[in-house]
Amino acid sequence: VQALDFFPTFMEIATRKKYKNKELDGESIMPLLKGKKMKERNLYFFRAYNTDQYAAIINGDWKLIKYHSGKYQLYNLRDDISETTDLQNVYPERFEKMKKDLRNWETNVVPEYENDYRKRINY
């Protein structure tokens, strides 16, 4: 569950109908509130401030992190919650699939920006 899921949830509560808007990234969490499971989906994260970590995708137990330097790391969060063992070479198909999903998301969602915060604030 992410904060962007609240609006579709509140709309579903208010209207008693599933709120459908393709421009929203969130999904109603009504199934969870009714004690059911939500369908699995990718969760995306983006950092625009000065850090090497740039973006990440979580799918089920799996997390792929992309760095500004071009490096990637793949973790199984169920088995390695501390993210100590990079598994991209152990699970190359999963790595490539998640990398492709992250690239598609970046293309469609992430705005162009200046990633050096010193330039953004005229430092």
Regions picked out by a protein language model, each given a short descriptive name:
Residues 9, 83-86:
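A general alpha-helix detector
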Residues 97-115:
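Charge-dense polyanion-binding interfaces
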Residues 57, 95-98:
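Hydrophobic packing residues in well-ordered alpha-helices of helical domains and bundles
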Residues 2-77, 108-112, 118, 123:
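C-terminal cap/loop subdomain of S1 sulfatases and analogous C-terminal strand-loop tails that border
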Residues 85-93:
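Active-site-proximal N-terminal segment of extracellular/periplasmic enzymes that hydrolyze or transfer
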Residues 80:
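Intrinsically disordered, low-complexity polar regions and short flexible loop motifs
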Residues 12, 35, 90, 100-104:
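Residues within well-ordered alpha-helical secondary structure of globular protein domains
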